[in-house]
């Protein structure tokens, strides 16, 4: 039985047509991922060149890297996973979900796998460094900015994590930064931009909660004046919140104001 096939020369235009279609499809996907407020000038030349050369094949390579990364995580080969994460980020620098997911994975999932506080800290710091690098490439993405601030708040809070005190000490030793001030910086900064993952009112309340937790921690550490200052800032933020939202959804603002004012009376006697 005679087999019929397309002439080899006829396949060339077909291949070119398919590759062209993939290229424009990838371009559209990239545009939608980046959004209209992206800053595309924050890439190093070594990051731009691979993206240009790979063209439409970049998406395929990224998918393969994600699969490889999941495998390395399951095998607990975390340092290989870190290298893969960096490669994915270079190929998708303006896709904030990449930075958010990988930062959380390092700060929470991978850090959890280690026993010693110091090893846990290394991965918490690696995750934050990774996320902040992403913020340089996506300076107007409210979601990424908020997540960085929330990690500084949640991961370093003694009520949430056993080794939070160690993390705060190591952060100040290595960077000179205060976790609560860092958290406030990033969360407040996120309010300047659109956020798809959280409502603005939730972010505003988070600022108030950070200040309240900072006050409680300072009091616990014996820093009464600092605790008083944080409590004062928290009251100021809650009052500003009530001016913007006089209906006080959930009815929590006034309850917190009452609680913080009571704490301030206690602190006044200690200062």
Where are the regions that the model predicts?
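A cross-kingdom marker for long, charged
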Residues: 229-271
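Intrinsic-disorder/low-complexity coil detector
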Residues: 6, 12, 245-248
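Short, Lys/Arg-rich N-terminal segment immediately upstream of the first membrane anchor
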Residues: 1-7
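Short coil/linker segments at helix-helix boundaries
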Residues: 26-138, 146-237, 245-247
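Hydrophobic membrane-insertion alpha-helices, especially the h-region
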Residues: 8-26
């Amino acid at each position: 039985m005679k087999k019929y096939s397309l002439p080899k020369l006829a396949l060339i235009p077909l291949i070119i047509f398919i590759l062209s279609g993939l290229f424009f499809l990838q371009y559209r996907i990239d545009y939608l991922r980046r959004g209209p407020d992206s800053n595309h000038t924050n890439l190093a030349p070594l990051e731009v060149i691979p993206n240009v050369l790979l063209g439409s094949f970049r998406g395929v390579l990224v998918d393969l890297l994600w699969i490889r990364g999941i495998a390395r995580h399951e095998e607990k080969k975390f340092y290989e996973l870190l290298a893969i994460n960096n490669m994915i980020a270079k190929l998708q620098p303006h896709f904030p979900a990449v930075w958010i997911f990988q930062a959380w994975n390092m700060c929470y999932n991978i850090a959890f796998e280690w026993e010693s506080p110091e090893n846990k800290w290394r991965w918490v710091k690696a995750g934050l460094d990774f996320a902040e690098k992403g913020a340089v490439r996506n300076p107007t993405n409210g979601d990424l900015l908020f997540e960085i601030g929330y990690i500084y708040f949640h991961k370093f809070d003694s009520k949430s994590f056993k080794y939070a005190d160690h993390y705060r000490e190591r952060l100040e030793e290595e960077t000179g930064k205060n976790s609560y001030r860092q958290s406030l910086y990033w969360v407040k900064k996120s309010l300047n931009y659109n956020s798809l993952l959280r409502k603005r009112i939730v972010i505003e309340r988070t600022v108030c909660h950070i200040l309240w937790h900072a006050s409680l921690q300072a009091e616990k550490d014996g820093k009464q004046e600092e605790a008083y200052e944080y409590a004062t800032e928290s009251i100021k933020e809650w009052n500003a919140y009530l001016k913007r939202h006089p209906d006080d959804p959930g009815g929590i603002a006034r309850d917190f104001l009452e609680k913080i004012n009571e704490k301030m009376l206690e602190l006044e006697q200690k200062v």
